[in-house]
């Protein structure tokens, strides 16, 4: 039988849970009998909460897939089905490969065992032999950077230490599939960069990554595909920039309609967000943007940079028809969607005499100057017949505490005024200071 090209396959998967009684206990034979004697017996359907109502989703091998959706839409339930923590109420679920997961903080760790002992236990649970875990023990400990704390009980660990240990174990057991639920922020800036580099290494090795997050910029920056869970169903799967754009539009429509944001599982019919009218989504024009990348000065992929660094935005496109009036736009956005800067070839009088097919658009920024935070760059090809766009997200990390969104080039000078007296003299090797008074 040929090996499947898909890592995860879900067909008509339903997951339901029993409601709790008023006392906070699950319904039992006794509680149902008492309800029946009081004339308050519930139907089977009334005693259930259905989180997933028929999930159909295929995740190809080697792809990074971002799962998005409102709180309560079933994203975490879906991951727990994939990892085997839950079993489907009905439907088929197929997993092809070894899974490692980063779910609830500290899940799978025994609080009274040391970090070293928990590494051994978790490695065995994830399918490794004792000898394999011991062979990788030093590498896992070194990556976690826990030092002498590795031999202390994990109940003494901070949340950041928990996350470091969990990430180190999950990424060093050689999984085929890595599952992550909202825990990419693993520790300080240094460890976050290290973790991102490890994730990039996973992608280069062709591993499958499934990520649940509310950070849409992370999905746009990291993922090959996005899947939107809404009302207990998969509402859309596709290009991350397109799926997140429709999701944002649906959220905006719900807010405009003053729709109640009740958890979908507690809402009759699943509480799906409003449908986005097709006219709200621009038609695709003659120039199609296929991929947008962020590169550094060496031409290498860029995820994190400092305010003083430059960057290059590179967009691959194809021409599908006459495009005499095409106009390329580049827009810098903050994490909350605010436009910080936008320009276009037309506004800068850039002549587009002949369009190559396929072609590459390059937008070079010598120095970005943005302060620390999450940003995205959107490249659009606009024409009278429609528009095509792509997005790449990135993070700026700054060691300096500053306010605002932009750092202009500047320097500080302290000089004597026209009528000033002799100033403070600085001896070589001493720290200069200005005294007032």
Curated annotation (Swiss-Prot):
InterPro entries in the cross-refs: AAA+_ATPase (IPR003593), ABC_transporter-like_ATP-bd (IPR003439), ABC_transpr_TagH-like (IPR015860), Bact_Polysacc_Export_ATP-bd (IPR050683), P-loop_NTPase (IPR027417), Wzt_C (IPR029439)
Binding site for ATP: 69-76
Superkingdom: Bacteria
Gene Ontology biological-process entries: polysaccharide transport
Key words, A-Z: ATP-binding, Cell inner membrane, Cell membrane, Membrane, Nucleotide-binding, Polysaccharide transport, Sugar transport, Transport
GO molecular function per UniProt: ABC-type transporter activity; ATP binding; ATP hydrolysis activity
GO cellular component: plasma membrane
Subcellular location: Cell inner membrane
Domain ABC transporter as annotated: residue spans: 37-256
Protein's UniProt name: O-antigen export system ATP-binding protein RfbB
UniProt source species: Myxococcus xanthus
Gene: rfbB
